A protein has these predicted regions:
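Membrane-interface helix-loop junctions and terminal tails of multi-pass membrane proteins
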Residues: 1-190
Length: 190
């Protein structure tokens, strides 16, 4: 169930985020224009619900290669276990992409001249790879620090309450970082 929870949480996170990106990037959609506040809320909700779903299903809700790598380095997670988490995350990314491609098929076909690069990937505002890497490290540090500090003691709560708090912390951390340490287009801690 742990592997399924990682897949499900990551799928919810990415499908929600990708769908919003499709809405603002493609023609013939309901939103059709970038609004930074909406973008922040959409990605924050996607992360919050992804974390909550994964947690409810009994998983640790890593949902991110950066978090898995951090557990390998800091917590002694084995390479084999890490590889399975990464596999679930990459499979979830592919499934979320496929669902969005199907859901927005007509919009993709109508958007021959629209920029599609940012739907399924992120890129920095200013391309400076060494600095961008450092920016990602800083954003990842803030994300992990906030999450770990805020969920201390959560294990003492009932399972449903744990999942709700974990989801809310994820929502809040992403919203905060999106409006502050975000120079690489929501790829922070990815």
């Amino acid at each position: 169930m742990v592997w399924l929870s990682e897949f499900a949480g990551c799928f919810i996170l990415l499908a929600g985020g990708y769908a919003y990106m499709c809405n603002i990037s493609l023609k013939k959609t309901q939103i059709a224009a970038l609004n930074y506040t909406e973008l922040t809320i959409a990605w924050s909700l996607a992360v919050g619900f992804g974390l909550a779903v994964s947690s409810i299903m009994g998983g640790p809700a890593y949902l991110n290669p950066g978090v898995v790598l951090g557990n390998v380095i800091c917590n002694g997670m084995g390479i084999g276990e890490a590889a399975l988490y990464l596999l679930m995350e990459f499979l979830a990314a592919g499934a979320a992409m496929l669902v969005c491609m199907i859901f927005f098929w007509d919009s993709f076909r109508a958007s021959t001249d629209a920029p599609k690069r940012g739907i399924f990937s992120a890129y920095p505002v200013e391309k400076n790879l060494p600095l961008n890497f450092i920016q990602e490290l800083i954003a990842t540090f803030f994300f992990m620090f906030i999450v770990f500090m805020c969920i201390t003691g959560v294990s003492d709560l009932k399972a449903g309450n744990q999942s709700l708090i974990i989801g809310m912390v994820g929502f809040g951390a992403v919203a905060f970082l999106s409006l502050s340490f975000n120079s690489t287009g929501y790829s922070m801690h990815a």
